[in-house]
Amino acid sequence: MNSGEKQDNLQAWGQQPSSSYSNTQQQHGQITGQIPLTITNQVEAHDNDFHMQDASNDELEKSKKIAEQPTEHPQQHHQQQPAVPRFPPQSRQPQAILRFPQPPITSINKANNSNSQNFFPQQEVLQSRPKKHRVSMTNAEAANTPGMPPEKLPAKKLSADSQRPLFRDSNVFQRSAGQFTNDNGPSSSSAIVGAPFDANSSSKPVHIQQFRNPNDAPVTKLTSDLIKTYKAINEKFQSFYLRKNVRRSTVGRHTSLDSSGKPKTGKEASSSDANLIETFSIHNAVPNTSSSGNQPHYDSHVNAPPLLDTNAPPTSTMVVPMRTETESQQQMRQKSSRGGPYNNGYDDQNYDYILKNGEIFDKRYVILSDTPVGKGSFGQVTKAYDTVTKEEVAIKIIKNKKTFFDQAQIEIHLLELTNAHDKDNKYNIVTLKGHFVHRAHLCLVFELLSYNLYDLLKNTNFRGVSLNLARKFAQQLGKTLLFLSSPELSIIHCDLKPENVLLVNAKRSQIRVIDFGSSCQTGHRIYQYIQSRFYRSPEVLLGIAYDTKIDMWSLGCILVEMHTGEPLFAGSSEVDQMMKIVEVLGMPPKEMLDIGPKTHKYFDKTEDGIYYCKKTRDGYRHTYKAPGARKLHEILGVTSGGPGGRRLGEPGHSVEDYSKFKDLIKRMLNFDPKQRILRTTLFPVSHTAYNQNLYHQQQIDQVPAVGSVYIEDNGMYRPVPTSSHPISVTSSFDDGDVIEIDPNRRRYSQQNYHNPNYQYSQQPQSSSQQQQQQYQQSQRAQLEKQQQLQQQQQQQQQQRQHLSHQPSQSVQQHSSSSSRSRPRQQDQAEWRTQLELEEAFKQRKAEEATAPRSLQYNPQQVVGVQLIKRVLISKLFQGSMSHGNVNAGSSRDMEKHDYPNNKL
């Protein structure tokens, strides 16, 4: 075989399709009698040489897809194609049209270098595909370009059938793009595209069909790339939330999960825990110049992974890897008996400290239980034993997060301030014994108390406590608010509710106010969202500036709930809360609504400036009643024997008692903070120096008696009568477990019940209290002397007025002097009736123009109606001198009998 025939065979071999590349290589070895071509060991060198040429990345991907073809092609593709005339021998160019780039043939090593010149006599190195396509070349350029047909055929419009791919078998594109194997070994990463080669007609060229892979279309390729990208992002999302759910569901232990989200067991879990797996989280990208205040943990807690920063501004969302646990941290966590995910195993997923029985805090406090006695958003409270003071205490362990740490520091400052002004603990505020930091947790040490008022309601099956016990709670809480609102403190509790009022003893009614974490001072208000929803005041709901009066609103809600057993305003949201308030108290004042920044949230305004309740989204006003339709009178059951009639017939629950309780609640729940009761307190018989000085500063002559509510309303102090039972007297009740027992006090006897001058047995008094009593007695003696002088002057004036015939002037002077001489502890209604009777008697006496007679009472001298009038006048004067009570009922009966036509 000469060199010309060999060249023709090589030209036909180059026109074969890539699917029959291995068979073609064997046939070519048989024809030429040479050793088959071998491929270099470095397949990557082909790609490097290929990238050095002008081929683009897209063309490289196409060549790799063509290489993914099976070793043995189906037989129907090897059918012989019709013969076509050959090109002139002088051109010596292959007729195959190359649709995809080929690696340079220079990278193929020949087994016999001496025979390589026989195959390519005119070219030393066969060039790769031309830089220009044949369509864009002229015939002259194609003639000078190796590997290109000399004549340019006219372009023909292909039909839809001709554009279909040649290989429709799906297995053609399922091979990997790394290499192509055959019987002789690995093949090249790319192949020559052409028609199948027939051994019988090896010297005849075949017709080549053009095809295009539809998967390589630009739109299809872009879509597939986007799908891959989003799929990768979703996988990273899933891995992050999967890890987050594991932290939430696992308390005090580590659980390994497989790809499906189920927990692993055995060797899989141990191997997965040993390997560090990097997870991803989606968070808002913030600048690196953020301050340390945005860090989620306390400054010493640096080992935990970062949290999601919800306060960061929304800039751009990106996927970043989270910090993984180091080997030292993992070993320390495994050695820890707690096994928590944070703080070297000492914190759980909620950043609460994992308690362990018998652990010692601050070298003196021994933890007494693994479970806390109370838990909240701030942290948890546990019971401990103080080895120094030999007493049990309560330790409040704050969460290991910076926000709670800063809030607890404010609570420490306010408690130290209140304890410094109340060293004797007279104002019912919890005592702070100390504070320290334990394993990055701020701990506060308090006195150990009993359960709270909400637990007390649960013990009564939410039937409520009696008015007597509610009055005792009101006395103590009012005293606390009076102390907190003093100018030296000016503290707003901001979270007064039954859960924050604790009993000192389960069998006593003495209480303590706790949880000053949300508190602030009047001039340093730092929170906008304060107070629990059921006890939130209207000014806070409307966004108006608030002061200490918001605690008085909360106190009114607490007192109603303690007696009825249910919250007065149980709103599910702020809008629902405002509507519940409007149902009972009516519409808020227009002045408040005009200045409220959040008024539009609850009310709409007409063109005339009238506010009305805002409609809901569905167009209806929900199921709310009209403003003021739900009466407080009916809620308390003033005339029906209490809430639901449960207190009907019980002592201390009369209509009069409920009426006074309702009036007190209405003054506490006034919309306008300026008209709301500032301070309310109930004072016992033995008064402290603080209260006594307060009375003298307000020019009050006499301290109110037992059972009176002392109210400061806009700076004016005045006594208001309460229920018939004094508050300081011990009493038992069957509606709860709280019983006040004091062996040093005597029970209230029925015979001395109406005697205001009766002195009950009291505990030994100190020197300061004795001085106060002496001062009080001296003041009373001076007052009696003044009253005697005034009466003498009145008698002299009456005689002069009778002689000068000026009755009207005498009546006015006598009424004014009588009003000044009246003791302050008498009932106002009885007082008013007696003054009117006295004025009527004096007026009729002046009209009779009789001489003044003796005012001494002698039953034997009572003759006729005129003597009965003088007896009444003498009794009135004697009552004013002795500061005693006057029997109003008998006086009214005598007045009716004597003067049937009198309108009084």
Curated annotation (Swiss-Prot):
Location in the cell: Nucleus
Entry-linked SMART domains: S_TKc
Domain Protein kinase intervals: 367-690
Spans annotated as Disordered: 1-151, 250-272, 285-345, 717-830, 881-904
Database matches in InterPro entries: Kinase-like_dom_sf (IPR011009), PKc_DYR1A/1B (IPR044131), Prot_kinase_dom (IPR000719), Protein_kinase_ATP_BS (IPR017441), Ser/Thr_kinase_AS (IPR008271), Ser_Thr_dual-spec_kinase (IPR050494)
Composition bias, Low complexity: 24-35, 112-123, 749-820
GO cellular component annotations of the record: nucleus
GO molecular function, one term: protein tyrosine kinase activity
Primary subcellular site in the record, as a coarse category: nucleus
Record PROSITE patterns: PROTEIN_KINASE_ATP, PROTEIN_KINASE_DOM, PROTEIN_KINASE_ST
PANTHER family recorded: DUAL SPECIFICITY PROTEIN KINASE (PTHR24058), SERINE_THREONINE-PROTEIN KINASE MINIBRAIN (PTHR24058:SF28)
Functional summary from the UniProt entry: Possible role in the function of olfactory neurons.
Family statement: Belongs to the protein kinase superfamily. CMGC Ser/Thr protein kinase family. MNB/DYRK subfamily.
Protein name: Dual specificity tyrosine-phosphorylation-regulated kinase mbk-1
Organism per entry: Caenorhabditis briggsae
Lineage: Eukaryota, Metazoa, Ecdysozoa, Nematoda, Chromadorea
Gene from which this protein is expressed: mbk-1
